């Protein structure tokens, strides 16, 4: 959708979402009025859902509090980056990824995360409206960095695969 109002005659495209008709990530090429999808990642594997899980865990409302998590990121330290990489998400060199669903309940439960997630990050989710701690700031910084790294890998792979200079 970002391609059509763009000034480009041709461009690669990348779409990321929590879940949109089961596709969470797709990329491909757009020329004129034709789109060709080259790769898709499907639910439950989703960077948006990963980010929403951390939004929930930090005590914010899913689908409306993600901006708060992003706003906390600059105040944190990246002390959970390795934990996220080692346990929650497997990112390939091409930027494709899979979440370890052993830590998440959003696919079938009423919570975004589960007790195993709580154990990984030293306790239960922050209760909404309770004071923020350094833990939430560090979680925000860590998931922000992991998300950005994954998207940059995707972008590099898309550029290498398509040779296109423009990305929508």
Spell out what each predicted region is.
Residues 1-168:
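Short acidic/glycine-rich loops and adjacent helix/strand connectors
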